[in-house]
């Protein structure tokens, strides 16, 4: 039986902001797959700290050392983006059982909307398991130091946002 190689994958998220935990998963996915597309969701229902353009640019800059990684913004359904990009695999990070419950439901919905779409789940490195964009934003908004949780360019942007 021949196996089809999973060569083009999507790592979707809001990435507001992209964290060291995200970057760890991206770097690991880049070693496993031929091409990784970071799909930055517009998420109009969320009150994001950074614009879609800023979030895409952060993703591009922090992954510039990875030749097989690109970042693109999208709005609408993720499955439509996956079809347009000719990708049939999603990379998702799982930090806790709560993440698993949520992702399990999403995976089943995605399969209904796009038969053949698979999800590959990666667990974070131990040092990143507690990091979330929400927590990083909260710490930054209240004047805390987030330098160890996000890439330097993102930390600088968060420090600038505090001054506004």
From Swiss-Prot:
The gene is coaD. Pfam families: CTP_transf_like. ATP binds at residues 14-15, 22, 93-95, 103, 128-134. Keywords: ATP-binding, Coenzyme A biosynthesis, Cytoplasm, Magnesium, Nucleotide-binding, Nucleotidyltransferase, Transferase. Pathway: Cofactor biosynthesis; coenzyme A biosynthesis; CoA from (R)-pantothenate: step 4/5. It catalyses: (R)-4'-phosphopantetheine + ATP + H(+) = 3'-dephospho-CoA + diphosphate. It comes from Vibrio cholerae serotype O1 (strain ATCC 39315 / El Tor Inaba N16961). This is Phosphopantetheine adenylyltransferase. Its EC number is 2.7.7.3. It comes from the Bacteria. NCBIfam families: coaD_prev_kdtB (TIGR01510), cyt_tran_rel (TIGR00125). GO terms for cellular component: cytoplasm. The lineage of its organism: Bacteria, Pseudomonadati, Pseudomonadota, Gammaproteobacteria, Vibrionales. The keyword Transferase applies. The record marks 22 as: Transition state stabilizer. It is an enzyme of class 2 (transferase). GO terms for molecular function: ATP binding; pantetheine-phosphate adenylyltransferase activity. It is found in: Cytoplasm.
């Amino acid at each position: 039986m021949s196996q089809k190689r999973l060569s083009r994958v999507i790592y979707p998220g809001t990435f507001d902001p992209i964290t060291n935990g995200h970057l760890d998963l991206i770097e690991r996915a880049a070693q496993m797959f031929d091409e990784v597309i970071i799909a930055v969701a517009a998420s109009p229902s969320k009150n994001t700290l950074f614009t879609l353009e800023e979030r895409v640019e952060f993703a591009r800059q922090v992954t510039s050392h990875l030749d097989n990684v690109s970042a693109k913004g999208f709005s609408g359904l993720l499955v439509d983006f996956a079809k347009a990009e000719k990708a049939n695999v999603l990379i998702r990070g799982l930090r806790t059982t709560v993440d698993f419950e949520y992702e399990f439901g999403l995976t089943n919905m995605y399969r209904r909307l796009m038969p053949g779409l698979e999800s590959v789940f990666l667990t974070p490195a131990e040092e990143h398991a507690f990091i979330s964009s929400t927590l990083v934003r909260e710490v930054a908004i209240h004047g805390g130091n987030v330098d160890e949780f996000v890439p330097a360019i993102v930390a600088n942007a968060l420090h600038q946002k505090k001054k506004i």
